[in-house]
Amino acid sequence: MANLNIFGQEVGADVEGWTTRAFPEKVVLKGNTCRLEPLDRERHGSELFSAYSEAGQKLWTYLPAGPFTNLEEYLEFIKELNETKDTVPFAIINKETERAVGTLCLIRIDEANGSLEVGYVVFSPELQKTIIATEAQFLLMKYVFDDLQYRRYEWKCDSLNGPSRRAAMRLGFKYEGTFRQVVVYKGRTRDTQWFSIIDKEWLRIRKTFEEWLDKTNFENGKQKRGIAAIRESLSN
């Protein structure tokens, strides 16, 4: 049924009791295979630079920053991230090795409207396509929706970045559209694809991750059921 105002115009649904959401804090988020720590250049910089170096310059093709030719350049980048007003960066720690293997950041933080974006998703070769990679994403989502009670969680990428598009869809983000020629970076034009998860979708997505990450879903390190299959079963 349409929601009409006093002029008979159709308007959006009322948001009862809405209040401005809290700005994300520099917290530690703990999982079974990993934890997220506030990104610190002294604690994590050298480990991350070493881990990223294994992938070479191609790791930075679709990111506005990098590649970095030496550790000092990368440490300066971490410093800039931590000084950016609407950015909260995290390092992903492999609990088995206690080493930093990647980063995730909360960016474009809009407390008034309860919206933010996950960005600077930089996974080392060691982290890519692992259980840790998925659990790290889940830990950050849980913090955003369960602890901070945000309404909207965004993912954006270069339209030509196939791995990023596929990752977003696998994790449960919905494609919203493409902004054409929205950015010039590294001397190139960029069309940006937008994806999101909103609060009313979160319960099913959370249950999907919980079932996928359960130890009974793995045998000799191999998944028995994929995330897409679990999510589909929960929608029936």
Swiss-Prot record:
GO molecular function: protein N-terminal-serine acetyltransferase activity; protein-N-terminal-alanine acetyltransferase activity
Chain ranges of the N-acetyltransferase domain: 47-191
Pfam families per record: Acetyltransf_3
Superkingdom of origin: Eukaryota
Annotated PANTHER family: FAMILY ACETYLTRANSFERASE, PUTATIVE (AFU_ORTHOLOGUE AFUA_7G00850)-RELATED, RIBOSOMAL-PROTEIN-SERINE ACETYLTRANSFERASE
Name of the protein in question: Uncharacterized protein YIR042C
Origin species: Saccharomyces cerevisiae (strain ATCC 204508 / S288c)
